[in-house]
């Protein structure tokens, strides 16, 4: 995957995520398909929470010359939390942070992409490898969101609610 491919994939994740979930209401965001499945809200929270961590990791490596970082912790924060703010606000923040990251990446030359960073759990990797890992991870979650949202149960029409008269009749 080239640098152009990586930047394109990273820039497309917020928009693709928004396209898939803009229509979800609170009940659908919290719906759990089964005990082993995350809710759509927790998947979205996971993507939204990782964006500033990935952005910070890349900025510190680029601007501060940081050579050690926990890449996995930035890419894959906890899945346990649900979405704690309105969906639209979370998606807008995700897009804003990702635009900032992509703007940074557009300015990188070969030396920057080839700069290595040491991850205590993953060993040495280039910043291009880090971005490839982020892109693959996020695209996997986009596919997961697509699949889970396609499998949501259809809302049921329980019929017209009648007016209750005196004594509940």
Each language-model region and where it sits:
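Short Lys/Arg-rich basic patches
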Residues: 2-6
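Short, contiguous alpha-helical
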Residues: 7-11, 15, 28-74, 116-169
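Acidic/histidine-rich alpha-helical segments that form the ligand environment
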Residues: 10, 76-115, 129-134
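Conserved catalytic core of Hanks-type protein kinase domains
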Residues: 23, 46-47, 107
């Amino acid at each position: 995957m080239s640098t152009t491919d990586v930047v394109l994939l990273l820039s497309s994740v917020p928009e693709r995520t928004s396209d898939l979930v803009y229509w979800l209401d609170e009940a659908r965001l919290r719906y759990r398909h089964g005990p082993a499945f995350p809710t759509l809200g927790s998947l979205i929270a996971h993507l939204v929470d990782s964006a500033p961590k990935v952005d910070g990791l890349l900025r510190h490596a680029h601007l501060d010359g940081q050579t050690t970082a926990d890449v996995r912790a930035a890419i894959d924060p906890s899945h346990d939390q649900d979405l704690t703010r309105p969906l639209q606000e979370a998606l807008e923040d995700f897009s804003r942070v990702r635009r900032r990251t992509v703007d940074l990446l557009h300015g990188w030359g070969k030396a920057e992409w080839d700069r290595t960073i040491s991850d205590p759990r993953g060993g040495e990797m280039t910043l291009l490898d880090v971005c490839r890992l982020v892109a693959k991870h996020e695209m996997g979650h986009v596919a997961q969101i697509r699949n889970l949202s396609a499998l949501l149960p259809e809302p049921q029409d329980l019929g017209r609610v009648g007016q209750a008269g005196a004594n509940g009749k």
